[in-house]
Amino acid sequence: MEGKEEDVRVGANKFPERQPIGTSAQSDKDYKEPPPAPFFEPGELSSWSFWRAGIAEFIATFLFLYITVLTVMGVKRSPNMCASVGIQGIAWAFGGMIFALVYCTAGISGGHINPAVTFGLFLARKLSLTRALYYIVMQCLGAICGAGVVKGFQPKQYQALGGGANTVAHGYTKGSGLGAEIIGTFVLVYTVFSATDAKRNARDSHVPILAPLPIGFAVFLVHLATIPITGTGINPARSLGAAIIYNKDHSWDDHWVFWVGPFIGAALAALYHVVVIRAIPFKSRS
C-alpha cells in the first residue's frame, strides 16, 4: 500500500513475509505458509527499499567491526586478564552489538549482518539470490571499512595487537577450528530461524519484538565457547574485514576455515529447520 510503512520480519524477503504493522496474530488453524521467495528477482533492483536494505547492512556491519575490534584490542593491550573485560567482555561486546544492530535494522533489511545468516536464509528460500548477493557484498565492504577506521585511529596498536584477525589458536588443528566454526554458526543460524519463524510470529505477536534478544545471546554464548579455539568467526565478513586490514601472512593461513565453516553450519541449520522442524517438503506432498 502506498504511503504506509511496513513491518519487515527479521530475515524476511521483501515480498512474501511483509505484513502491515498491527496485523493480528493468527491461530495454527488459520496459518498459511508464506510462499518461497523467487530464486532471482530482478524487479527488486528498481525498488528503493532494496538499495536501502543494503546500505543498512553496510552501516550495521561497519559499526559491528568498529566496536568489536576495539574491544578485542583493548583486552590484548591489558597486562593481565584481571585488568580488562577479558573473554567475557569480548563475548558481551559481540553479542550486545548483534542484539542492538538486529533491533535497529530488522525493519529495514532483516538484520542479517553476517553472510552466513544471509546464506542460510537464502537456502531456506527466505530471500532471493539477488538480495543475498547484494547483502553479502555490502556486509563485506562494511566490515572492511569498520576495521579500516580502527586502524586509521590506532595504526601502531592495530598492527601490534593483531587487528582482531581470526586464526586457529596454537594447540588446535585446522579440523578443530573448522568444527568449532561449523557448530558455532549452526547455533547462531538455528537461533535466527527459530526467533524469526513465520508460523510462530503469526501465532504470538510479541515474538518479532523479542527476536534480537535470543540472536544476540546466541552470539554471546558461542563466543564464550570458541574464542580460545578460533577467536570466534561465525561471520565471514567479520573475519574478512579484519584479515584484509591487518594483512599479515598468518592471518590468511587459516582464513578458509572462517568461510567454509560458517557456510556449512548455516546450510545445516537451514536444512534442519526446513526439513525437520517445519517439515515443509512433507507438507507440500500432502
UniProtKB/Swiss-Prot annotation:
UniProt KW keywords: Acetylation, Cell membrane, Membrane, Phosphoprotein, Repeat, Transmembrane, Transmembrane helix, Transport
Predominant location category: membrane
Any single biological process term in GO: response to water deprivation
Gene3D superfamilies: Glycerol uptake facilitator protein
Phosphoserine: residues carrying this PTM: 284
Membrane-spanning parts: 55-75, 92-112, 133-153, 175-195, 209-229, 257-277
GO molecular function, one term: water channel activity
Entry text on domains: Aquaporins contain two tandem repeats each containing three membrane-spanning domains and a pore-forming loop with the signature motif Asn-Pro-Ala (NPA).
Name the record gives this protein: Aquaporin PIP1-1
The organism of origin for this protein: Arabidopsis thaliana (Mouse-ear cress)
